[in-house]
């Protein structure tokens, strides 16, 4: 209906804002965290090392962020802002793909999925280009330094694996001894990627994984 079409229009506008901001606006957002991430990406490329000796790490290794990917695109483009923007957009697409598959696992309607994407892609930014240290949703997940984009991917992958396992178990119970392995390939692939991303986040952020991933998995 008209409401669904309007929701799709909102999603397109949100996506356009995210893409434009990442490709053309990052140089105007140089808060402490963002500028540190940009500098780290430059040094990663210059030193050809994921942990450059010329950069003093103050919190995490930054491996579970767009920074390593941004370093690659910086080397290709010669522009750290464009390189970081491209890296952010790629990770945003990955987040969207996993989020879509997760919502599909719940058998949601197209309207419900569209509503979910409106919330996911909301480009919330702090007003007036606040640059002291922008910690808005956009800066943390969708653009700028994107500190939590890879962490979000990791958590969405794990949640997707859990939901798939639950649905697989339910199908097995309903089918009795009948073979229900037709979706095993997708499940195994998601388990592999969830494991790899969890390891990456564990190496980079340590205690974050223990609190947000390992403890919930143990309880599960």
Q: Which residues fall in each region the model found?
A:
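Juxtamembrane segments of multi-pass membrane glycosylation machinery
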Residues: 46-50, 68-91, 95, 107
């Amino acid at each position: 209906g008209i409401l669904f079409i309007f929701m799709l229009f909102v999603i397109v506008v949100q996506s356009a804002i995210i893409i434009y901001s990442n490709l053309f606006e990052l140089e105007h957002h140089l808060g402490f965290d963002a500028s540190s991430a940009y500098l780290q990406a430059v040094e990663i490329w210059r030193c050809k090392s994921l942990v450059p000796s010329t950069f003093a790490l103050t919190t995490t290794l930054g491996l579970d962020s767009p920074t390593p990917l941004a370093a690659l695109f910086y080397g290709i483009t010669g522009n750290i802002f464009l390189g970081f923007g491209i890296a952010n957009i790629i990770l945003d697409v990955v987040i969207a793909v996993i989020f879509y598959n997760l919502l599909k696992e719940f058998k949601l309607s197209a309207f419900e999925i569209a509503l979910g994407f409106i919330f996911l892609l909301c480009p919330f930014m702090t007003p007036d280009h606040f640059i002291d240290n922008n910690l808005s949703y956009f800066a943390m997940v969708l653009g700028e330094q994107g500190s939590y984009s890879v962490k979000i991917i990791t958590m969405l992958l794990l949640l997707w694996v859990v939901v798939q396992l639950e649905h697989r178990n339910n199908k097995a119970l309903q089918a009795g001894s009948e073979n229900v392995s037709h979706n095993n390939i997708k499940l195994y692939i998601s388990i592999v990627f969830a494991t790899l991303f969890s390891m990456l986040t564990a190496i980079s952020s340590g205690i974050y994984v223990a609190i947000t991933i390992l403890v919930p998995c143990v309880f599960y």
